[in-house]
Swiss-Prot record:
<dbReference type="GO" id="GO:0045259">
    <property type="term" value="C:proton-transporting ATP synthase complex"/>
</dbReference>
<dbReference type="InterPro" id="IPR021278">
    <property type="entry name" value="ATP19"/>
</dbReference>
<keyword id="KW-0812">Transmembrane</keyword>
<dbReference type="GO" id="GO:0065003">
    <property type="term" value="P:protein-containing complex assembly"/>
</dbReference>
<keyword id="KW-0813">Transport</keyword>
<keyword id="KW-0066">ATP synthesis</keyword>
<protein>
    <recommendedName>
        <fullName>ATP synthase subunit K, mitochondrial</fullName>
    </recommendedName>
</protein>
<dbReference type="GO" id="GO:0015986">
    <property type="term" value="P:proton motive force-driven ATP synthesis"/>
</dbReference>
<feature type="transmembrane region" description="Helical">
    <location>
        <begin position="15"/>
        <end position="32"/>
    </location>
</feature>
<keyword id="KW-0138">CF(0)</keyword>
<keyword id="KW-1133">Transmembrane helix</keyword>
<dbReference type="GO" id="GO:0005743">
    <property type="term" value="C:mitochondrial inner membrane"/>
</dbReference>
<comment type="function">
    <text>Mitochondrial membrane ATP synthase (F(1)F(0) ATP synthase or Complex V) produces ATP from ADP in the presence of a proton gradient across the membrane which is generated by electron transport complexes of the respiratory chain. F-type ATP synthases consist of two structural domains, F(1) - containing the extramembraneous catalytic core, and F(0) - containing the membrane proton channel, linked together by a central stalk and a peripheral stalk.</text>
</comment>
<dbReference type="GO" id="GO:1902600">
    <property type="term" value="P:proton transmembrane transport"/>
</dbReference>
<comment type="subunit">
    <text>F-type ATP synthases have 2 components, the catalytic core F(1) and the membrane-embedded component F(0), linked together by a central stalk and a peripheral stalk. The central stalk, also called rotor shaft, is often seen as part of F(1). The peripheral stalk is seen as part of F(0). F(0) contains the membrane channel next to the rotor. F-type ATP synthases form dimers but each monomer functions independently in ATP generation.</text>
</comment>
<keyword id="KW-0406">Ion transport</keyword>
<keyword id="KW-0472">Membrane</keyword>
Amino acid sequence: MGAAYHILGKTVYPHQLAIGTIVSVVGGIVIASSGKKAEKPAAPAIQAGSSDEEKFIANFLKEQEAAEKK
């Protein structure tokens, strides 16, 4: 059947090496990309003493987000 490699005393054909390589690479990618995904922690609620303070904090955060987008 053509050329073959002798690895650890066994005859291994080139197509078997190719299939083994493809399976190993795809299997590694699947294993690496699977698993538990870490959830992003939610932002804590605003702890304001009064409604005016809460409005000030909310307005400040909106301004900062707008400045970051620019």
